[in-house]
Each structure stands twice: as structure tokens, then as C-alpha cells.
């Protein structure tokens, strides 16, 4: 079988061309006549469920009607007609003339042959295809799913299958296909729960299946379109122009401009990102032409910490310097009503910055964002409703600021909308009367599914629930949209990353020239963060200043950051292998030999001298150590790190590398025996040598790299694969040279592939409050996904009672946010409410290995749905580690604290507010803590 185009090269435009006569021979209208833009089919009501699908295919010139003005949506479709739709839509051609069915004499035999070769059709049991029979719903499901799987991958059946009241009536051949068609959103049952498998399919049902199928298999060509991504020095002042009937962003010359870039996280938490090296990296290495400065107002932001505004000024100046548009984001979040008292400084804030820059030659780089996410969130003040009334509230807040900013210039203004800026459709129904206004949309690809169609005409606003469809509605109704925040996770920051879904969204945004800013430039431990976070025992947090080279290395980016960088640049996303690791063990940069000495059993040990020279281990006297053969290394000088007091975990290591530095190229031979609790002595299989040709110029001498594998050194493999202990605490090196008396060794490094060690927690059990842990389970407690610590949660004895326990240590290099490295316990319980309780109380025990500096700050957070899923308890419990000796000490020598945190003073919840879950966060306040802790008797009181 021939296929004209496979998915990667089959653009949607080509698909459309291939299926211009999709419904022929059903259509009697002249398909060569040009259509007017008006939808012509009077028998398809604009309020019908099928209208968006038929309109979608008609506007793309995919289908014709049964006459010039009728579509006959409820007429049946034959098996041949639907086969023609699929084969032409997918660009399939038959490669053989051996028609497989008895009834060859039919108008569609070529398309049927192509579909057969692709595995899309199989025919009837009597050996015929029956082209003129009406196609049933189950047959359509089977053919559509086979077509999808032909171009994509085979789908797995969903774990929870869709139950239909007539499931027993679905033929065996179609049972899996009906389930997969539901997953693909191609077909579903009626409102009464019946699939009606034997009922004939209709033209309108075919339109939905074909429209949706083409959307699913269309290539994402627009991911790589960068023609409109222009810097401010190229595009100049921004304006809105009409393009293809929709308002879109353009430069001074009227040609489309798309902004792509990143949003900071809250500047009060991650303000270190505002530095020159970072802005250079974003502009030059990432290709960003825009940055968004997210200045929170509440949540310890501008309202209580006004100096955060200084970071906004710094960010604007850096954006000017490095040729990026800059969004000044008044980050309305908690509370969700921008008219709340905490936001009362908005007018003055925008006026101050507008006045400061109104005469600046790069003033047009600035974009104003007036309200990040209006929402029902009533944490710290009132929220607003997800309806017209909610939009009226936003509009009431925004209009005076818009009027003031319009008097000072024509900079683009972005306005948020209800339901966390997911409702630009509401803004389109009642827009602000001013020039250069765009409306925000926010989405997270794990939570907000795509839609390739809009709504039927007259759909009430209360039923407009798909975020992408809301964007389509806004565009179709005359307003411009800007995606000022989107992420690759779920909306709560967890789960994913959802890159396939992100590709669909970004392809849509790029196709419609909608600008976008990804959330966010942070090393916080959340999926949507762009940088590698701290996770105890796994990763160190990436510095938000990339350093003098002004580039973050790929491994410093998170999965999301690596993906988004590629999408900003419009290049293929090729993720690095994150299972590879390298650990530098001895670098000799401290001016010492780092524990190395001549081994007591070494031959000619009296002739050998070790020293540190130029931050490398120098060996003198090697003219007595000249065996460079592979197996007879025993006569060579033997060194060992007997004086090294440290150890290193080398789980998964497969190679040991050593830099060899010489005055003149020569041959050097090295054999190695790593040592540790799992391996004391095992003879090397061979010595590894480098020859004259391996050396390259290095400073005043030459350098080569010796690579010793686990095959060369069995001890390396023994330690790296031990199920008990993977620490290397020493190494023995056999060193020989051909004719060099002095050489130096440097950068002794192990590398390999990370092996994931399963963290085994004690049984989770049933969520119970009070939590006493006396049943030997965790009683529902677990690590939150954003926890900086995810070590084993076990039940241990503390002060004569069972307690929840874990080990951890805070890092020496501190992020600015003490929560980033904090253990975060998460507890979910049905019908969790405060009731008449005033406190969260529990016993906290410390078994310290190191605890002499700083403090542990214990925070509590509820995540009630009615409060925007975040309600931080205003008070904390502080443990001053410098005064640990003043704590009560138990009989088992644990430090004991009776923790009480006031929950009565939370104004935004009532006694019967559903709290959903409780987080306990043990934040680092410049402490050196390392050890084990215990939590017991968690309760409300």
C-alpha cells in the first residue's frame, strides 16, 4: 500500500486538499463552485450539537451538502462513503490491484483496497465488503479507531471502561474499538447511556468523527513557526490589527508579532531570577522576546513587602537592555477579587511606573497586566464569581486604571477574567471600551483539555466550560487574547509533565498568533518549574543566576524547562538522558593530596614522593615504575587514599576516569581497585594505558584521560551494584610510565547510570484524626508532591508510643525560599472540617545528628476547594536549634516539643468549611539540621 504522506509531514492544509470531495458521491451540489463564507446549510441549526463539527469541515472546504442549501444531517452513510472519507482524509492509496472482496464492481473499490491494506477494513464474514450497506455505529467506531492507530500508536484500553446499558449488544469485533472511540472523543453514547451499536450512522455523526479524527492526527507544524517571533528592536511598538477576521498582536508595521517567553514565579520568593546573566540566557539561549514579572500583592508580596517593586524596576531595565518586551504583572491571586482592600494600591502602582517610563525611548517594551487571576479564592479577602457578575467586578476595577494608562501612552494592556483567567469569553461579551486591550487566558495542560471546535450559537455562558473553546469564542467575537500563564502540569502544580497536550495547545496558540508566557522561572519542587529543584539525596537546586557563561546547562533545567526552551525557540524537543550521572570524587583543589599516600605494600615506596602541585596530585620518582603492560601492573608504584576521611555513594557507576598530566607525551598505565564495605580487595582485570597520541596540549604540558570500566576493575562493579552498601571509601591505584619520572593525576571521577532505589514506606492505612499511629500504619499521611524530602515514612517508637518518622537534612546551599527544601506532609480526609477546634496540635520529637544553627519553622496549610485550594494558617511554630538544649528530653533521649498552631484566626474559613487536606511544612530557616524526627498525636483541639 502507498501512503501519500505520513503524520509528521501531513499538514492540515494537505489533509484539507485531499478531502475536498469528502462526501462525494453523497453530495449532489456542484463541488467546483466556490462557496461564500456564509454557512449555507439551512437544515443545520446553529444551536445543534453537530453544528460546530459541520461548520469546521465546511469552512475548511472539506465537505459539501446534499444540495446548495441542505446538508441532510440525519441521513445515513454507506460503508463505501465512510471508507472514502477515511482514505482520502489520511492520504492512502492502494499499492495492489488484488481486490480482496467478492463485490469488486463498485465505485469506491480503490479506496476500499487502500483501507484494507492499512488494516482499517476487514469486510463481512461472507467475503464481501457490502459497499452500499449503511454503516452502523459500531462499524464506524471500529474503522475510525483503526485509522487512528494506523497513523499513531496502538491505544491501550482504559482501566475504567465506559459502561453502556446495551454493552452486551456490541459485536465482539467492535467492543475494544467502542471503548477506544470514547477515549479519543470520537463517539459516545446517548444521554440515556446507550451506545446503539447496530443503529445506522448519520451524516452529522460522520462529520463529528471525521472532524475530531483529523484534529487528533494532524501534524503540529505550527510548533516550529517562528516568523512572527520578533524582538522589540525589530517589531517596535505593539498594536492590534485584524487578521483573517480576528484581532491579533502586530508590530509598528502592522505585520503579526508573537511574544514567547517565561514568567517569573513570585518575586517575593524567587527574586534572584532578576539578574543580568539570567536575562541574557533567556534572550540569547532560549530565544525569548518577552518576560513576565509576577509581582504578588498578597501572600507576603507587595502589600506587606513594598520593596519587591524594586525588582520590577530592575526587571524592566534588564528587559530593555536585552531586547525583550516585559509584562508588569499585578499578580492578583489570593484573594481573587481585584477590588479587595489588599489591592487598593494598584492605580498608584501603575501610575508611578507609567510616569517613570513615559518618556523613555524603550517605553513601548512595557506591557501592563492588571489582574493576574480573578477567582473565587477568598484567602485573605473576597473572591468573585465565575459568571458575568464576576467579569463586571473585574471590569469595574480595571476601567479607571485603563483610562489612566491610555492618557499616558498606548502600551498594550492585558486584563484577566474570572475563574483564574479561564473566561476570556466573558470579556468578549462585554469588552472594555479602549484601544490596545487584550484579555488573558491561563491553562495547565494536565487539567485543561483542548477543543478543536467552538460552541453552538447561543450556548449560555454557564455552559462554556472548555478553556480552548473559550479562547475560540473570544477570537470569534472580536477581542484579542494573550496566554499570560500556562504550565505543563495540572492546575495545582502536580502531575505530568503533559507534553503531548502542551503540543496541541502551543500548536493552536502559534497558529492563531496568540502570544504566551510559560509558568515559571523557579527551582521550586513543582512540575511546572523550569529548573531542577532540590530533592534530598537526588538533586541540588539550580542557581537562578546561570553564571558568567550566561547559559543554563541542560541538566540544570527541569523536564518542563527543557521542553519549553525548545518550544520557545521553535526547534525539536530532544530530552537529555537524565539517568546518566557523574561524580567528581577527588579534585585536589584544596592544595592537599586529599588523603592519597604511597601504599604500605608498594614496591619502591622509598623512591616515590606525593605532593599537590597546581591543584593536582603530583607523583615523583616514577622512573622505578615502568611496567606498562596490561597485566603485569604489580611491579608498579601503588597509591591509596588511606588518609581520606570521606566516602561517596557510587550506586550505578560503570566508569572511573582520571586526568593524567605530563610534561611531554608518553605512555602511562593505571590499574584501580576501588574499596568500600562491599568490596575490600579484588585484583584488577587489566591496567589501562594512554599513549603519546592520546595527549593534548594543556597549560605548559599535556593531558590525557584514562577511562577504567567495571570490566577492568571488578571492585567498581561490586560496590556499584551491591544491594547492601554502595559507598566507596578508598581506592588503590597502580601507576606506571614508559619514561616519565613525574606525572600528575587530577579529577578522579565516577560515572554511570542512576538506579532508582525504591523508597519503602510503612503501610499508609486509613486516614484517621487524631493520628496516634498505634495501629502500625501512617494513618493516611504521605509526602506532598512538592516536598523537598521524600525519604521513607516509617512508624517508629518515640517516648514509649508509635510515631510517624523520617530522616532528612537541610542543604548547606540555601534557596531563597525555605519551603523549597522542606519536608511537606500531606493528609487527606473526607469531610475534614475545623469544627469548634482552635488548634492543630501534635508531639514533635528530634533525634539530631547535627542541629546547632538556625530554626525549623512548622507551617500548616489547608487546601479547601471553596478557597481556591490554598489557605495558609497565619501562625507558625518555631524551633530554635541554637536553644535545643532547653527543650524537654525524653527517656529515650529525644528532644520533645508540644506543637500548637492556632487555626481559629483564619478569617476566610468557617467551622464547617470543607478543608479537604492538611499540609504540615517543616521549613528551613538557615539551619544546619540533620537527623531523624517523629510526629505523634496529631489532632484538632
Swiss-Prot record:
GO terms for molecular function: cellulase activity. GO terms for biological process: cellulose catabolic process. Keywords: Carbohydrate metabolism, Cellulose degradation, Glycosidase, Hydrolase, Polysaccharide degradation, Repeat, Signal. Residues 1-29 form the signal peptide. The active site is at 373 (proton donor), 485 (nucleophile). It catalyses: Endohydrolysis of (1->4)-beta-D-glucosidic linkages in cellulose, lichenin and cereal beta-D-glucans. Its EC number is 3.2.1.4. Residues 37-94, 95-158, 161-224 form the SLH domain. This is Endoglucanase. It comes from Bacillus sp. (strain KSM-635).
Amino acid at each position: 500500500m502507498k501512503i501519500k504522506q505520513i503524520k509528521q509531514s501531513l499538514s492540515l492544509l494537505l489533509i484539507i486538499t485531499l478531502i475536498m470531495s469528502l462526501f462525494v458521491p453523497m453530495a449532489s451540489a456542484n463541488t467546483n463552485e466556490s462557496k461564500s463564507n456564509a454557512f449555507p446549510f439551512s437544515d443545520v441549526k446553529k444551536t445543534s450539537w453537530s453544528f460546530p463539527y459541520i461548520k469546521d469541515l465546511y469552512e475548511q472546504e472539506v465537505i459539501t451538502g446534499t444540495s446548495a442549501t441542505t446538508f441532510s444531517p440525519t441521513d445515513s452513510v454507506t460503508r463505501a462513503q465512510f471508507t472514502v472519507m477515511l482514505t482520502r482524509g489520511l492520504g492512502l492509496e492502494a499499492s495492489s490491484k488484488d481486490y480482496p472482496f467478492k463485490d469488486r464492481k463498485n465505485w469506491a473499490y480503490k479506496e476500499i483496497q487502500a483501507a484494507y491494506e492499512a488494516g482499517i477494513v476487514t469486510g463481512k464474514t461472507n467475503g464481501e465488503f457490502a459497499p452500499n450497506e449503511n454503516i452502523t455505529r459500531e462499524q464506524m467506531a471500529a474503522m475510525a479507531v483503526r485509522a487512528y492507530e494506523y497513523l499513531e500508536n496502538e491505544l491501550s484500553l482504559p482501566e475504567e471502561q465506559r459502561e453502556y446499558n446495551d454493552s452486551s449488544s456490541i459485536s465482539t469485533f467492535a467492543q475494544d474499538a467502542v471503548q477506544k472511540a470514547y477515549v479519543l472523543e470520537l463517539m459516545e453514547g446517548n444521554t440515556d447511556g446507550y451506545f446503539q451499536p447496530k443503529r445506522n450512522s448519520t451524516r452529522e455523526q460522520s462529520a463529528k468523527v471525521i472532524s475530531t479524527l483529523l484534529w487528533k492526527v494532524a501534524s503540529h507544524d505550527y510548533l516550529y513557526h517562528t516568523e512572527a517571533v520578533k524582538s522589540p528592536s525589530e517589531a517596535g511598538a505593539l498594536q492590534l490589527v485584524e487578521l483573517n477576521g480576528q484581532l491579533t498582536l502586530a508590530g509598528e508595521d502592522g505585520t503579526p508579532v508573537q511574544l514567547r517567553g517565561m514568567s517569573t514565579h513570585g518575586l517575593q520568593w524567587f527574586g534572584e531570577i532578576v539578574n543580568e546573566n539570567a536575562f541574557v540566557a533567556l534572550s540569547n539561549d532560549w530565544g525569548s522576546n518577552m518576560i513576565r514579572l509576577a509581582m504578588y500583592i498578597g501572600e507576603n508580596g507587595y502589600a506587606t513587602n513594598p520593596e519587591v517593586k524594586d525588582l520590577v524596576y530592575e526587571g524592566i531595565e534588564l528587559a530593555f537592555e536585552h531586547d525583550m518586551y516585559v509584562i508588569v504583572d499585578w499578580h492578583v491571586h489570593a484573594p481573587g477579587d481585584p477590588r479587595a482592600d489588599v489591592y487598593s494600591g494598584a492605580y498608584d502602582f501603575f501610575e508611578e511606573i507609567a510616569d517613570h517610563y513615559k518618556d523613555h525611548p524603550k517605553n513601548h517594551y512595557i506591557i501592563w497586566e492588571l489582574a493576574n487571576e480573578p477567582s473565587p479564592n477568598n484567602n485573605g479577602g473576597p473572591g468573585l464569581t465565575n459568571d458575568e457578575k464576576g467579569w463586571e467586578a473585574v471590569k469595574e476595577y480595571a476601567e479607571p486604571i485603563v483610562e489612566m494608562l491610555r492618557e499616558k501612552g498606548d502600551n498594550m494592556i492585558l486584563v484577566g477574567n474570572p475563574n483564574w483567567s479561564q473566561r476570556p469569553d466573558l470579556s468578549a461579551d462585554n469588552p472594555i471600551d479602549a484601544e490596545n486591550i487584550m484579555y488573558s487566558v491561563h491553562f495547565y495542560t494536565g487539567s485543561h483539555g483542548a477543543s478543536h471546535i467552538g460552541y453552538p450559537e447561543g450556548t449560555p455562558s454557564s455552559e462554556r466550560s472548555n478553556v480552548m473553546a473559550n479562547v475560540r469564542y473570544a477570537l470569534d467575537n472580536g477581542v484579542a487574547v494573550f496566554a499570560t500563564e500556562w504550565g505543563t502540569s495540572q492546575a495545582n502544580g502536580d502531575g505530568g509533565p503533559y507534553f503531548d497536550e502542551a503540543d496541541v495547545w502551543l500548536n493552536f496558540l502559534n497558529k492563531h498568533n496568540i502570544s504566551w508566557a510559560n509558568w515559571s522561572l523557579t527551582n521550586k519542587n513543582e512540575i511546572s518549574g523550569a529548573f531542577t529543584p532540590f530533592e534530598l539525596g537526588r538533586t541540588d537546586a539550580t542557581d537562578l543566576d546561570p553564571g558568567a557563561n550566561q547559559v543554563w546547562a541542560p541538566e540544570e533545567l527541569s523536564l518542563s524547562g527543557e521542553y519549553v526552551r525548545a518550544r520557545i525557540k521553535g526547534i525539536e524537543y530532544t530530552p537529555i538522558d537524565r539517568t546518566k550521572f557523574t561524580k567528581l570524587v577527588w579534585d585536589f583543589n584544596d592544595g592537599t593530596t586529599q588523603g592519597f599516600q604511597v601504599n604500605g605494600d608498594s614496591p619502591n615506596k622509598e623512591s616515590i614522593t606525593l605532593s599537590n602541585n597546581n591543584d593536582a596530585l603530583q607523583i615523583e620518582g616514577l622512573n622505578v615504575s615502568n611496567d606498562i603492560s596490561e597485566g603485569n601492573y604489580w611491579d608498579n608504584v601503588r597509591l591509596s587514599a588511606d588518609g581520606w576521611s570521606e566516602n561517596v555513594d557510587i550506586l550505578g557507576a560503570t566508569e572511573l576516569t582520571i586526568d593524567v598530566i605530563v610534561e611531554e607525551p608518553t605512555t602511562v598505565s593505571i590499574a584501580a581497585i576501588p574499596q568500600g564495605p562491599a568490596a575490600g580487595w579484588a585484583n584488577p582485570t587489566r591496567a589501562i594505558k594512554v599513549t603519546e597520541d592520546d595527549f593534548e596540549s594543556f597549560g605548559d604540558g599535556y593531558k590525557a584521560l584514562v577511562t577504567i570500566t567495571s570490566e577492568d576493575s571488578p571492585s567498581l562493579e561490586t560496590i556499584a551494584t551491591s544491594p547492601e552498601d554502595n559507598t566507596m571509601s578508598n581506592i588503590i591505584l597502580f601507576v606506571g610510565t614508559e619514561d616519565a619520572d613525574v606525572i600528575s593525576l587530577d579529577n578522579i571521577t565516577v560515572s554511570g547510570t542512576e538506579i532508582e532505589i525504591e523508597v519503602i514506606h510503612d503501610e499508609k492505612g486509613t486516614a484517621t484524626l487524631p493520628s496516634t499511629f498505634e495501629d502500625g500504619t501512617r494513618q493516611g499521611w504521605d509526602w506532598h508532591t512538592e516536598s523537598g524530602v521524600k525519604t521513607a515514612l516509617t512508624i517508629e517508637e518515640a517516648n514509649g508510643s508509635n510515631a510517624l518518622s523520617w530522616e532528612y537534612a537541610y542543604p548547606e546551599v540555601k534557596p531563597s525560599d525555605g519551603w523549597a527544601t522542606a519536608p511537606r506532609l500531606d493528609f487527606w480526609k473526607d469531610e475534614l472540617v475545623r469544627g469548634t477546634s482552635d488548634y492543630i496540635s501534635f508531639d514533635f520529637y528530634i533525634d539530631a545528628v547535627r542541629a546547632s544553627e538556625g530554626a525549623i519553622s512548622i507551617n500548616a496549610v489547608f487546601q479547601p476547594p471553596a478557597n481556591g485550594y490554598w489557605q495558609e494558617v497565619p501562625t507558625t511554630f518555631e524551633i530554635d536549634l541554637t536553644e535545643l538544649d532547653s527543650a524537654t528530653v525524653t527517656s529515650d533521649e529525644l528532644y520533645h516539643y508540644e506543637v500548637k498552631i492556632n487555626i481559629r484566626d483564619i478569617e476566610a474559613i468557617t467551622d464547617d468549611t470543607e478543608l479537604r487536606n492538611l499540609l504540615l511544612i517543616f521549613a528551613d530557616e538557615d539551619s544546619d539540621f540533620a537527623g531523624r524526627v517523629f510526629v505523634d498525636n496529631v489532632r484538632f483541639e
